[in-house]
Design a protein with these regions (language model features):
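Cytoplasmic helix-loop-helix junction between adjacent transmembrane helices
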Residues: 1-35
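Juxtamembrane intracellular "pre-TM" segments in multi-pass secondary transporters
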Residues: 79-107, 293-295
Length: 295
């Protein structure tokens, strides 16, 4: 699982190194849409395969799929010449990526956003059961409620990439974060299941813009030879959030109503977007994550 987790940062690094600079937003949006689609379809196909064959066979099929992906990347994906990258790296002064202010903020943002996602995961089945008034078919219903966010993400991710290209990736990030915060808090208001699912779908439309914008800013703020490292750091920050989120959510559920956990998932993003807005570069030149200033 650890080796497989490195596939996504590597794919992002290859994409960022090959796509023209002016199209990076759309590329990141499409990548995020593809990942979201996989997140929606994966559990569906996994469950279907387990029913048709067996759980053990599902692992073999998943491993075979990864092997096919490896072969496709090995033979059909070509990286830029490494010699040019080495010369560029030798010509510039080596700087730790973690010392670059914009990188620090984007890593913080990635970690906190991932924390808010996983914060709700431990309580979601119980909360959905509370909304529908019973625990009947709770696994199936929970899967549907989770999948609506994925569906909206597939629709909206490429559009957010285009918005970032047109108006700037940082403004797109602030807008997506603010929208996700608002809709995340609104999700805690309904007392029945259908309105809750509808608000999750709407929130997914804004959430879809967060990670493409983060990845685009990181791409524009780092030299090509550091793309692999920066996306590895970004993914590591997300995994830290993935560890902390369920612990916080489960701990809160022991003492507070489940609605409080759902509400907090959106509320946490408000101070984050305020902080990012306050710390933003004050000149338009840097709104796209210009590597000239790295602020």
């Amino acid at each position: 699982q650890g080796f497989a987790s490195g596939l996504w940062p590597a794919c992002l690094a290859i994409m960022a190194s090959t796509v023209p600079r002016e199209r990076i937003g759309l590329a990141m949006g499409i990548m995020q849409g593809g990942m979201t689609a996989g997140g929606v379809l994966g559990p569906f196909f996994g469950g279907a395969l387990a029913e048709l064959f067996s759980m053990r066979m599902t692992f073999f099929i998943g491993g075979a799929a990864l092997a096919v992906i490896t072969l496709l990347i090995l033979f059909f994906i070509h990286e830029p010449p490494r010699k040019e990258q080495k010369k560029a790296a030798a010509a510039r002064e080596k700087t730790s990526l973690l010392k670059i202010p914009v990188v620090q903020r984007m890593l913080l943002c990635a970690g906190v956003v991932q924390l808010t996602i996983l914060l709700q995961q431990p309580v979601m089945p119980m909360y959905i059961g509370e909304l529908q008034g019973s625990m009947d078919r709770i696994v199936f219903v929970t899967g549907i409620v989770f999948s609506v966010v994925g569906v909206s993400g597939v629709i909206a991710s490429p559009l957010w990439g285009v918005i970032g290209q047109k108006w700037g990736y940082r403004p797109a990030l602030y807008t997506a974060l603010a929208g996700t915060a608002c809709f995340g808090m609104i999700q805690a208001i309904p007392d029945t299941l259908v309105p809750f699912a509808v608000w999750r779908f709407i929130g997914g439309l804004t959430f879809a813009g967060i990670f493409p914008a983060i990845n685009a800013v990181l791409t524009m703020s780092t030299p090509p030879e550091d793309r692999g490292r920066i996306f590895g750091l970004s993914y590591a920050a997300q995994q830290v959030g993935s560890v902390i989120g369920p612990l916080v959510g489960g701990g809160m559920a022991m003492y507070l109503p489940l609605k409080s956990v759902i509400f907090l998932g959106g509320f946490i993003l408000l101070p984050l977007v305020i902080f990012l807005w306050y710390m933003r570069p004050k000149n338009e030149e840097n709104s796209h994550g210009s590597p000239a200033q790295l602020r």
